[in-house]
Amino acid sequence: MSRISRRAYADMFGPTVGDRVRLADTALWVEVEKDFTVYGEEVKFGGGKVIRDGMGQGQMLAAQAMDLVLTNALIIDHWGIVKADIGVKHGRIAAIGKAGNPDVQPGVTVPVGPGTEVIAAEGKIVTAGGIDSHIHFICPQQVEEALTSGVTTFIGGGTGPATGTNATTCTPGPWYLARMLQAADSLPINIGLLGKGNASRPEALREQIAAGAVGLKLHEDWGSTPAAIDCCLSVAEEMDIQVAIHTDTLNESGCIEDTLAAIGDRTIHTFHTEGAGGGHAPDIIRAAGQANVLPSSTNPTLPYTVNTVDEHLDMLMVCHHLDPSIAEDVAFAESRIRRETIAAEDILHDMGAFAMTSSDSQAMGRVGEVVLRTWQVAHQMKVRRGPLAPDSSYSDNFRVKRYIAKYTLNPALTHGIAHEVGSVEVGKLADLVLWSPAFFAVKPALVIKGGMIVTAPMGDINGSIPTPQPVHYRPMFGALGAARHATRMTFLPQAAMDRGLAQELGLQSLIGVAHGCRRVRKADMVHNTLQPVIEVDSQTYQVRADGELLVCEPASELPLAQRYFLF
């Protein structure tokens, strides 16, 4: 039997079982747990390579073969870190295993035929497209920025740069919901809209859900009173949609105890649960320990650095329509920004108490930095806290699975769309992101949306090859024309489907039905199930989880930062 060195094999076909890969310039390493390919029968495209007629490519018709195969990919997902070929059919993941020609090769589960396109993923990492569950739809250009960061799904609300949208993630009322659903139909990203949940009577909430709101948002700027919370959750239970909440920073209508009492044992998604983005001062962070609370962070506080506190005051004044000449407005802003709770947030993420990350796009958050900042937190916690059990000093597989779930599967579960998106699993939309390991979490090599490349770095269009400078991200064919409709999905509640809303509005995109989110609990948050008793000292703002003081020095230097953005 012929043999080659591990190094030569990895250079040719990518890493295999036992090999380690460093994630960009972080302190994080992953180890390949399983290899689905067959040694000696690997497929690779190119001159003199395997995927040729009668060799790695068979004679089957399109119905029996894949539309697209990603060869020799290193998949990083909540369920594993494995080497495999990925097959895509009709825009969905159809197989994960061994690609090739079953007529002449053993173990083939991903058949390649004359109708099959190939993307070479040797030496590349493949992850699921990210889900940003805290989007202010302030401008449509957010979509391009998000796609080039590896995010392929938006959940949020808004109508453009209106004052209400600048502050709150709500698309209020049936008319605006209809117009935003029609606008979203032309955007090459999956979208679900949140209606305004602040009402003390149910009728106006029911009509928003019937008009297409996949969830409702309670926001203090509209009045997150106990009555509004109870009414909103009652309608959500009745109509099977999720509720997201930004609680009462000023504690005017009640403190955290009153909010938790109004919520009861009903499931709710708490936004920026640390509190700098808004919420009961100083102890909204306590909510992260509740069994029915699905807690997320927004990215301005992630990770805690020497600059975090200083930038927050101005952000807050702008986004929430505050006046720096009014002392009460300044006091309101300052009450939300606490070094101690911001520092504790990183640690609670590492412990698995905070389950999700998101952006808060253009409203105290950066839409293109959800993926990047999630991994900066993971790095910082590795440096500060060491390996995370059951990891060893050799690899960080469990920590990596915990963190990737925060912006993929867990927000999908939270909003009832995990049957369509959120992981690299058979049957789901082929929303896939390819990364060169050196650029992981910073600059994708390709972004695939519903089976088509939607954006990619591309060189000089008049070049003789695709790679000459200047290279920058450009929209690809998956983002154009009717291909957008065949590769993107609009999420609607069952109530909207029952009335034929998609047909009524003339929507041409794929339609996904959000459902089952009322049954989701903290225990269902993959790799992020911890429910500690969290205490906050009202004078010092020190945070304890199950009695342990959570203290973390701010970072003065981070990976995934300046060295990647010089040009």
From Swiss-Prot:
Ni(2+) 1 binds at H134, H136, K217, D360. It holds the Pfam family Amidohydro_1. Its main location: cytoplasm. The active site is at H320. Its EC number is 3.5.1.5. Carboxylation allows a single lysine to coordinate two nickel ions. SUPFAM superfamilies: Composite domain of metallo-dependent hydrolases, Metallo-dependent hydrolases. It is found in: Cytoplasm. The modification N6-carboxylysine is found at K217. Ni(2+) 2 binds at K217, H246, H272. The keyword Transmembrane does not apply. One of its GO terms (biological process) is urea catabolic process. Heterotrimer of UreA (gamma), UreB (beta) and UreC (alpha) subunits. Three heterotrimers associate to form the active enzyme. Belongs to the metallo-dependent hydrolases superfamily. Urease alpha subunit family. PANTHER family: UREASE. This is Urease subunit alpha. It comes from Pseudomonas putida (strain W619).
